[in-house]
């Protein structure tokens, strides 16, 4: 059996996912694509999925008889409408982050999915499938460092586009830490503060960069997350967790060590594509496998998308107020209690 996938949005990550569905993963086939830029959609189909039909819009693609599952990789503000339409059609949907740009939008998706009665949505929080983060999770579960006390994270990008704004440091970038850290710590967020250090000369006038986000969990763990999207030297993701009995850190991505011209060192990756390539493969294979087995979606859920959105809203409020803001979430519905399975491969 094959899961026939329709892809909405054929930009950077849409193309990447189409390529992996067609060339790397098993049990899937891209049968449909669409993009508001129809020339791009045609070009991408022609390059990576010659058999795919190019549709004029998301609604036509979702309705297509040869589309079993939908992959949403359009711009964030377009996600909610596509996910809701896919749910209405009773089709599985993998949605890149953010699930929706507002907490209310995420809640509408949660409600639609619960009304449908089966989990169909997986959110593209790929770090939960990254071997390094899985090793951290395992170490915490085995209590190798005892109770976690403090976390230090770094999320650096080489440079940001002109369209990247100060709030996007939260909604577009920190959102990955927001998701992965509460999953790692098995804890909930309580408060947040955002500090603005001296601004880099490499950021455009409208952008505050870097930023320091201080999150406190209900158990009292303090997380210090640096977001620096014009760091210039590379794509750098770090995470260190200090516990009562020791410290664990995210492993470096293995790379050849080169000694040449009087220097010794390794290449620094330049973007998310290579850093999380294996994680994207595993998350999407999990989505396809759930479809092949006709089982409820088991990856990061619509509820996880909602938690991330509520937390991001509080972070943006803290950016604006300069004060500590609280993060309040309703109780997780029973429908989502047994979600977000951890893949076994570490
Ligand atoms: N999980 C991850 O690490 C990453 C996730 N993303 C997420 O993936 C999404 C796409 O990001 P990129 O590929 O970098 O952006 P992009 O700008 O390269 O591509 C987005 C594409 O969506 C199309 N589009 C916009 N609205 C549309 C609509 N209503 N219907 C159909 N097509 C539409 C655009 O024309 C564009 O071609 C974003 O939500 C982003 O946050 C992006 C990069 C990495
Ligand atoms: O999701 C991603 C991008 O959309 C975002 O713009 C980057 O800052 C992140 O590093 C990347 O993982």
UniProtKB/Swiss-Prot annotation:
UniProt pathway: Polyol metabolism; myo-inositol degradation into acetyl-CoA; acetyl-CoA from myo-inositol: step 1/7
Enzyme class, UniProt record, top EC level: oxidoreductase
GO aspect biological process, one term: inositol catabolic process
Skewed-composition ranges (Basic and acidic residues): 322-331
Annotated region (Disordered), positions in chain: 322-346
Record-level Gene Ontology MF annotations: inositol 2-dehydrogenase (NAD+) activity; nucleotide binding
Entry annotated with the keyword NAD: yes
Function, as annotated: Involved in the oxidation of myo-inositol (MI) and D-chiro-inositol (DCI) to 2-keto-myo-inositol (2KMI or 2-inosose) and 1-keto-D-chiro-inositol (1KDCI), respectively.
Annotated protein name in UniProt: Inositol 2-dehydrogenase/D-chiro-inositol 3-dehydrogenase
Organism taxonomic ancestry: Bacteria, Bacillati, Bacillota, Bacilli, Bacillales
């Amino acid at each position: 059996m094959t899961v026939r996938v329709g892809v909405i949005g054929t930009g950077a990550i849409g193309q990447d996912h189409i390529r992996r569905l067609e060339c790397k993963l098993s049990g899937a086939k891209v049968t449909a694509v669409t993009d508001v830029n129809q020339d791009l959609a045609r070009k991408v189909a022609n390059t990576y999925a010659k058999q795919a039909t190019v549709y004029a819009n998301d609604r036509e693609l979702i309705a297509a008889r040869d589309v079993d599952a939908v992959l949403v990789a359009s711009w964030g503000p377009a996600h909610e409408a596509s996910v809701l339409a896919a749910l209405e059609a009773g089709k599985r949907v993998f949605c890149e982050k953010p699930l929706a740009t507002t907490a209310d939008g995420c809640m509408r998706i949660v409600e639609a999915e619960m009304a449908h009665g089966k989990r169909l949505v997986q959110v593209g929080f790929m770090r939960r499938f990254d071997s390094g983060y899985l090793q951290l999770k395992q170490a915490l579960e085995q209590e190798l460092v005892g109770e976690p006390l403090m976390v230090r994270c770094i999320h650096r990008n080489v440079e940001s586009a002109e369209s990247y704004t100060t709030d996007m440091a939260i909604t577009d970038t920190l959102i990955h830490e927001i998701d992965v850290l509460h999953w790692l710590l098995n804890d909930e967020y309580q408060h947040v503060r955002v500090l603005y250090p001296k601004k880099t000369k490499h950021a455009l006038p409208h952008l505050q960069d870097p930023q320091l986000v201080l999150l406190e969990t209900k158990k009292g763990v303090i997380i210090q997350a640096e977001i620096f999207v014009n760091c210039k030297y590379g794509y750098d993701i770090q995470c260190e967790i200090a516990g009562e009995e020791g410290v664990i850190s995210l492993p470096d991505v293995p790379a050849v060590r080169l000694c040449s011209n009087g220097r010794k060192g390794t290449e620094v990756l330049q973007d998310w594509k290579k850093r999380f390539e294996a994680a994207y493969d595993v998350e999407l294979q999990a989505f396809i496998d759930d479809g092949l087995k006709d089982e409820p979606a088991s990856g990061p859920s619509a509820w996880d998308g909602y938690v991330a959105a509520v937390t991001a809203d509080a972070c943006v409020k803290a950016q604006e107020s300069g004060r500590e803001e609280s993060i309040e979430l309703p109780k997780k519905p029973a429908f989502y209690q047994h979600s977000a399975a951890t893949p076994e491969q570490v």
